[in-house]
Amino acid sequence: MSSEVRWKICWENELEASDHAELADFFCKTYGPTGAFNAKPFETGRSWGGARPERRAIAYDSHGVASHMGLLRRFIKVGTTDLLVAELGLYGVRPDLEGLGIAHSVRAMFPILRELSVPFAFGTVRHAMRNHMERYCRDGTANIMTGLRVRSTLPDAHSDLPATRTEDVLVLVVPVDRPMTEWPAGSLIERNGSEL
């Protein structure tokens, strides 16, 4: 599958309005089937749902956007330890390409992780994605962690809602410049911002 797509690795500032429109359409079509609310942030042409990524890996094929992964460097707190990570998020594969191996092509982001000199990449996924993530992690490149809660700020302020939410999600950790044994202990991760 990776030979049929071309990858564009770019900084957020390199995207044009037309790129954001195409990505917003991609996210509506990709996230919409998982629940109408999941596509809502993208209905206005915005190509991000919470925090805005600084780098993106976008795969294109003859039908447009095929896959996407966003990256944002940030400090999170794991237990009592502040930790610089590259948060990975805004992951999607066009529905007609699911199951064809394109997820493994997201490894196009790995050289960027090394270039940014972050100790770890970090991301979260729903428990419903566990089987998919286990297949992805089978080669030991990434690790799935369970039993962790992640607290994030809401992307928008609402007077009738709390400012943060705490979720029980699967945590994906990719050792980049440090071994997995150096990931801090702790059952709560403070994202200190909105989910990517």
UniProtKB/Swiss-Prot annotation:
Record's Pfam families? NodA (PF02474)
Keywords of the record, alphabetical order, are: Acyltransferase, Cytoplasm, Nodulation, Plasmid, Transferase
GO CC terms for this protein? cytosol
Task: Report which superkingdom the organism of origin falls in.
Answer: Bacteria
What EC number(s) would the UniProt record show?
2.3.1.-
What InterPro entries does the database record attribute to this sequence?
A: NodA, Nodulation_prot_NodA_CS
Described purpose of this protein according to its UniProt entry: N-acyltransferase required for nodulation. Acts in the production of a small, heat-stable compound (Nod) that stimulates mitosis in various plant protoplasts.
Protein name in UniProt? Nodulation protein A
